[in-house]
Curated annotation (Swiss-Prot):
It comes from Oenothera elata subsp. hookeri. It is a single-pass membrane protein. This is Cytochrome f. The lineage of its organism: Eukaryota, Viridiplantae, Streptophyta, Embryophyta, Tracheophyta. One of its GO terms (molecular function) is heme binding. It is found in: Plastid, Chloroplast thylakoid membrane.
Length: 318
């Protein structure tokens, strides 16, 4: 009886350990793949050259647009609208080799002091325009750099960021100046992972010249292509994942770096910039006072002119 209980206890412990291991592996896999690879490998998403690092993985160049107010007052919430246009009818190759809708993502690089507006400061009208996307800071110490994605492109090809402007009265590092804002936006999956390996959303080239002596279609998708050097019989096997369409056939002579597959990528990355002026309220008040003074001066001038004309008219009648 004691041995039976001991055996049951051992099996339960083994099952719990196995379940925990599977959970950890699965959890790690998900976290490594979602959402922003750039956060894992780069301290700052914008290089000294001005290039945003997302372009290292998303090789195709596509447009992106950003719209912000020309000027904002301190300690106010405004909208930065990022548009990531693409053809809604196209499908991309997913990680499992099947076709699916495109996802989108964006990184917004704000000036120091600007940050994501807290929910309590966002008006109901703005909340309705924003929807319910999940924004996050690029780093806990970099609240001025915001990222989102991947999110469904059908719903979020236009992303509205609620931004809180800083107040120079409380933040001495901020001044009433014109500031640049940078944005990067992608649609679809990348072609290269941060470790340099290829995804299945890109073209695969021959790693050797020779004759395609054998093509094996793998059970779970993809191909093994054996290339034989005609001069010495040396063989090289190129592994093609599920997704790209095969372009070569057995017996075909190929060159080094010749495409073995089509390029399935239908997405791409783009970057842009805009400018916003942090406006001094006193300057605005001064401008309004000046305009009011000009308008009043014009009114008095018109009244004085009419009064003068009346005097002239009365003298002529006299």
């Amino acid at each position: 009886m004691k041995n039976t209980f001991s055996w049951i206890k051992k099996e339960i412990t083994r099952s719990i350990s196995l379940s925990l291991m599977i959970y950890i592996i699965t959890r790690t896999s998900i976290s490594n793949a979602y959402p922003i690879f750039a956060q894992q490998g780069y301290e700052n998403p914008r290089e000294a050259t001005g290039r945003i690092v997302c372009a290292n993985c998303h090789l195709a160049n596509k447009p992106v647009d950003i719209e912000v107010p020309q000027a904002v007052l301190p300690d106010t919430v405004f909208e930065a609208v990022v548009r990531i246009p693409y053809d809604r009818q196209v499908k991309q190759v997913l990680a499992n080799g099947k076709k699916g809708g495109l996802n989108v993502g964006a990184v917004l690089i704000l000036p120091e002091g600007f940050e994501l507006a807290p929910p309590a400061r966002i008006s109901p009208e703005m909340k309705e325009r924003i929807g319910n996307p999940s924004f996050q800071s690029y780093r806990p110490t970099k609240k001025n750099i915001l990222v989102i994605g991947p999110v469904p492109g059908q719903k979020y090809s236009e992303i509205t960021f609620p931004i809180l402007s800083p107040d120079p009265a409380t933040n001495k590092d901020v001044h009433f100046l014109k500031y640049p804002i940078y944005v990067g936006g992608n649609r679809g999956r990348g072609q290269i992972y941060p470790d340099g390996s290829k995804s299945n959303n890109t073209v695969y080239n021959a790693t050797a010249a020779g004759i395609v002596s054998k093509i094996i279609r793998k059970e779970k998708g993809g191909y093994e292509i054996t290339i034989t050097d005609a001069s010495d019989g040396r063989q090289v096997v190129d592994i093609i994942p599920s997704g790209p369409e095969l372009l070569v056939s057995e017996g075909e002579s190929i060159k080094l770096d010749q495409p073995l597959t089509s390029n399935p990528n239908v997405g791409g990355f783009g970057q842009g910039d805009a400018e916003v002026v942090l406006q001094d309220p006193l300057r605005v008040q001064g401008l309004l006072f000046f305009l009011a003074s000009v308008i009043l001066a014009q009114i008095f001038l018109v009244l004085k002119k009419k009064q003068f004309e009346k005097v002239q008219l009365s003298e002529m009648n006299f």
